[in-house]
Amino acid sequence: RSSGGSGAGIKALLDGTADFGLVAREVKSSEKEKIKNYQEYKVGIDALTIAVNPNNPIAKIKDNLTSDQIKKIFSGEYKTWNEVDPSLPATEIVVVTRDLGGGAHEVFQEKIMGDTKVTDKAIQAPSMGALVAKIIENENAVGYASYGVAKQNEGKIFALKVDGVAATPETIVDGSYKIQRPLLIVGSGELTKVQKAFMDYLRSDAGQKLIEAMGFIPVK
């Protein structure tokens, strides 16, 4: 596959430059309808954790945020931490996101924000690594970090529960942790021999390790 994010994979299928691609988001019904003999295979799941700096008092006082609180934080309606919880200090909330046109933000927008825009004061990080670095360096920062990156930085960032549910491989796979996106192989028509071999590889132990290395939780 060529890189270029999830949108590029679907676009290549739609305009016929590819008959097989990898996308890291749900495929819209309107897109499926335009692809001849549309097929999809789920090979992994990524979740977005709501991450703060471990020195932020919220990590000790309140390890959970509701979807509504997250929405108010990221929209800028809550400007200081004490608006989230009166026992927290009145320090300014620093919101960190990925670029607003990317796949990760699309998932966050859909699962949490709905029609509400993220504050224009948000720092847009060019990568998940850069997003996490901002949280590590700023005690008042909050951002959505993909599960794999959050695991790699355990101890340096703190992942809050969302609506009382912690992000774990179990809650992500069973769907009870809601801020998540699938890693899909999408195609048009029957798999060719080469495509089938690639699918078999992804479902093998080596392939599952590769999916984990990409920061996803493998799904057989």
Q: PLM features: residue spans?
A:
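Exported/periplasmic ABC-transporter solute-binding proteins
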Residues: 1-220
